Amino acid sequence: MFKYDAFISYRHVHPDMEIAQDIQRLIEAFVVSKAVPAVPKRRDFLVFRDRDELASGELGEAIENALENSAFLIVVCSRRTPLSPWCRREVEYFREVRDPSNIIAVLLEGEPEESFPPELRDVRKLVRTPGGAVQERRDEFLAADVRPDRVRAEGFPGYEEVERDPRALRALRRKSAALLKRTEINRIMATILGVSYGDITQRQRERKMRRAMALVSVVALVLGVFATTVTAMWVKSMRSEEKANERNAA
């Protein structure tokens, strides 16, 4: 049993920092549907996200302890990630204490070969083919893709250049956050929970539908009570008016 469900590794640059914050917030607020197969009901998820850029290339005891006590490592990958000795060391250390299959990459810009740190690009695993032979293959870590269309487009200059235009940076950051919230958080949670993306997506959709139907029922009930009250008040008012007219006629 681990203290943290995930450790988030990221560059302390924009928008990597904001996306890391969004990932932490969405994981810790995630509610697992009771209908998701083979997953016990979870009340709380806990994520470790270091707020401070380390002053040296050494991780420090606190970071190493957090990595050792994390079930998964989430790496926010942008073109500047491979340039960070701290991100690379976090991936390297996690691989020393945990299986590489417990690493989740979130692609923020670029392609895996340019945005993944070398420690993610050079991982190999042994797999058994349908014929029974054992082969060494490159491990694939991409679990979530939060690149908006503009970022995917050929000729995108990169976030390091976009940072000079705060308005453009905010717009792209909002689009990435929307992608994360709409679909990609489910991919991340499917990996953490050990279930398929389809199971998570379908159950979350059903949960939202049930909540919407419950809300509609409450609104209908409130409107019904309101209509009944207004009708009763109108009938009472009409009767009072009739009695007043009868007294005046007498």
Where in the sequence are the language-model features?
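Conserved N-terminal substructure of TIR/SEFIR domains
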Residues: 1-76, 94-102, 109, 192
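Charged/polar helix/coil "stalk" or linker segments at domain boundaries
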Residues: 5, 13, 210-250
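Switch/connector loops and helix/strand junctions flanking conserved nucleotide-binding motifs
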Residues: 16-18, 56, 82-85, 111-123
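Activation on extended, non-transmembrane soluble regions of large proteins
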Residues: 70, 100-101, 113-118, 122-123, ...
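Conserved TIR/SEFIR loop-to-helix hotspot centered on a Trp-containing motif
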Residues: 79-98
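Acidic, Ser/Thr-rich peripheral helices and adjacent loops at domain boundaries
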Residues: 115-138
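N-terminal intrinsically disordered, acidic low-complexity segments at the extreme N-terminus
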Residues: 131-132, 136-202
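Membrane-interface, cytosolic juxtamembrane amphipathic helix immediately N-terminal to a transmembrane helix
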Residues: 196-214
